[in-house]
Amino acid sequence: MYLSRQLRLLPRANIACSLSSSGAHYTTAAPAEDAPIEIPNRIERSPTDLLQALASTVARDYTAPHYKYHDDPFLIPMSNAAKRTYAMSKESGRKAAKWIKEEHRELFMHQEAQPAIEKFAPSMVYTEDSVVDETSLAQLISQGELKDAVLVYNLLEQKGNPISPELKQSLLELVCFHNNQEPIPEEYIEERWFLQNNKRRERSGKTWKDGDLAEKLYSEIEPKTPQSYASLIRGMAKYLQCERAYALLQEAGEKQVQLDTNTFNSVIEIVSFLKDTAEQRWQLCKDLLNEMSQQKLRPNLGTLNAVLQCISTFGNFKVARAAALQALPEFKQLGVNPSLGSYYYLLIIFCRERGPVSHVIVDILNDISGKEFQIQHPKDTYFFATAMDVCRNHLHDKSLAKKVDELLHTGKNYDLVGDSFKESIYYRNYLALLCQTESTEDFMLSYDLLVPNIYIPEPGIMEEILRAIEINGAVEYVPRLWSDMVVFDHTHRESLLLYVLRILVDNKPNPDSPAQAQLPEQGAKVALDMFERVEEAIKRLRKVSFTGQMLGDILTLLVRGGSYEKATEVFAHIDKNQHRIPGTPSLNALIEFVDASVQEKSPSQALFALQYAVENNFDSRELAKRIHEGFTLNETHLSKLKSLVGESFLDK
C-alpha cells in the first residue's frame, strides 16, 4: 500500500524512468513480440448471467427468505398459503404495470434505451381496420403472439389476401402447440410456478378443440406435407384426441408420407389411451417402433421416455418389468442415454406400492451421483420428488434420501426440482423420513436449515414430528414447535392441539435434564396461549373448539407450571360451559387441580372441583379424601362437603 501511494505521487516521467531502469536491471524475459490481437466470438448471455455468477461465489443463506420476497420480518411469508399469496401479489403488480402500459400507450412511446427494448414499448394493437400483410403475420408467429396472429390471419382471409402455404404451416404449428389458447406469458414466472398444482387437480381427458382453427388450416394446406401431418398429429396427441391422432398416423403411412421421430414419439405416449391391456399396449408400442425402423428413423431420448411412459401404465408388474429391462439396453446400444425423466419412469415401473420391494434406485444413484443435469425432457422435473418418495415410503432408507438430496444440490440440479407442488412433496417426504430415522438433535439441525424459508411443514408432517419427539422423549422441543405451529397457522387443527397437550401432560420433565428444567413454565405458557387462541377462534367461528380433554390438559399444565390463578379461570370456564363442551376433563386433571388448591389454601376452588366431579358422575371419593385431609374446613365448607359426598364418607 505504501509503495502504491508513493508511485501515484511521482510524476509520470519519473515513474517510466524508474520502471525502465529497474526493469533493465532485473528482468530476464525475452522482449515482447508484436502478436495479432484475436477478438473472441461473442458469447450469448441471458439477463441474469451476471447475477448468477455473483450468487455462485457465496453459499446459500438458510436464514433468509427466497429473493422474491421482501427481506423484512413483517413481509416474510410464514405459511404455504402466504408464500403463494405474496408471490402472486407481486406478480399482480407486474400485470398491473403491463395493463397501464397498454391502456395508456401514449405515455410510453418514447425510447430511452439504445438499442430499444421491445418490452418497454406498448404492443401493437390490431383491429378490424388494421392494414396488415404477410409480413405482419410472420412477425407475430415468430414472437409467439397467438391471439394477434389468429386475428391477423382472419383479417387477411376476409380481405382475400393470399397467404403462402409456408406461413399457414407456421401458424398451424403455433395453433396446434397451444390448442388455440393464449398461453401464460413467460415473464409471469410465479403464476406458472403455482399453476401446475391446479392443473394437476384437473381431470385428465381430451381437451383438443374439434373442428377449430387447427383443422381448418390443415384442410387448406394442399398438397399435404409431412410437416402438416406432423403438426396436427402432435397437437391431437398432446391434447388427447388419441383416436384421430393415431388414425392420421396410419393415413400418413398408407400415403407413404415420411414423418419424423418426434411425431412417432407423440403417438407412443398415448398408447395407453388406445389399448386396454398391458399385452396390447406393448404390442402396439413395438409395432410403432418397427414402423420407425422401416422408415429409417433414428430414435431419440423422447422415444425412450415415450416407451417407458407406456410401460409405466402396465398393470401387470411382471410384464412391465420385463419390457423395461428389454427396452433400456436396446436404446443404450443406439446411443440414447437416459435423462432424469427416464429414471423417473423406471422408479414408478419398479417401485410400486403393491409390488415387491425394488432397489433399482441404488443402481440409478450409483450411475448419476455427482453429475449435473440440464432439462432434456418435461418429465425430468418429476425425478427428485419421486426418488424421495421411494426413499421414504418404498425403502425407508435415510442414507439413500441423503444421496438424493446431495444430487439435488449438485451444480444447478435444483433447477430441476419442478414447481412449488413437487418441491413441497420432496421436502415433505425428506423431513418425514429424517424425523423417523434420526435422533432428535440431528433432525432438528436439518429442521432449522429447511424451515420456514425453504419448506413449511403441513399439519400431517408436524404431527409426524411430534410423534417422533414423543417416542424419543425429547419433550423440551415441544414449546418451540408450538411457536412454529402458531406462525404456520396450524392452531385451528384440533388433532394437533390435542397431540401437543397430550405429549406435555404424559411426559413429565426429567429433573436430571438441564434442557427440561424450564419445561413446566414453558408448558404453562403453551397451554395458556392455546386457551386464548381457541377462545378467539370460537368468537370468529373458526373450525376449532374446546373439548373436555383439551381443557383438562390445559388445566393440568397450568397447575404444573405454577399458574394457579390462570388455572382457576380455566376451571371456571369448564364449569360454566360444561353443557356446551363435548366430553369432560380426566379425573387426574381434577386431582392435580385439587392438590394445587390445597397448596394455595383455596378450599372454595377445591370444593368447586368436587362438585363438578359429582355432577359428571366421576368417582369423587379420592377428591373428597384429599380435600378433607388437606384443609381445616370451616362449618360452611364442611357442610358443602357433606352435601356432596354424604356424612357417611366423613365418618370413615
From Swiss-Prot:
The entry's keywords: Mitochondrion, Repeat, Ribonucleoprotein, Ribosomal protein, RNA-binding, rRNA-binding, Transit peptide, Translation regulation
Predominant cellular place of this UniProt entry's protein: mitochondrion
Cellular compartment(s): Mitochondrion
Transit peptide segment: 1-37
Pfam families for this protein: PPR_3, Rib_mS39_PPR
GO MF annotations, alphabetized: ribosomal small subunit binding; rRNA binding
The keyword Ribonucleoprotein is annotated on this UniProt entry: yes
Deletion consequences: Larval lethal; arrested development at 1st or 2nd instar and failure to molt into 3rd instar.
GO cellular component: mitochondrion; ribonucleoprotein complex; ribosome
Gene3D superfamilies attached to this UniProt entry: Tetratricopeptide repeat domain
InterPro entries linked to this entry: Pentatricopeptide_rpt, PTCD3, Rib_mS39_PPR, TPR-like_helical_dom_sf
Source superkingdom: Eukaryota
Annotated PPR repeat ranges: 129-163, 225-259, 260-299, 300-338, 547-581
GO biological process: mitochondrial translation; regulation of translation
Role description: Mitochondrial protein that may have a role in mitochondrial translation. Essential for larval development.
Similarity comment: family membership: Belongs to the mitochondrion-specific ribosomal protein mS39 family.
Protein's name in the database: Small ribosomal subunit protein mS39
Organism of provenance: Drosophila melanogaster (Fruit fly)
Gene this protein is translated from: Ptcd3
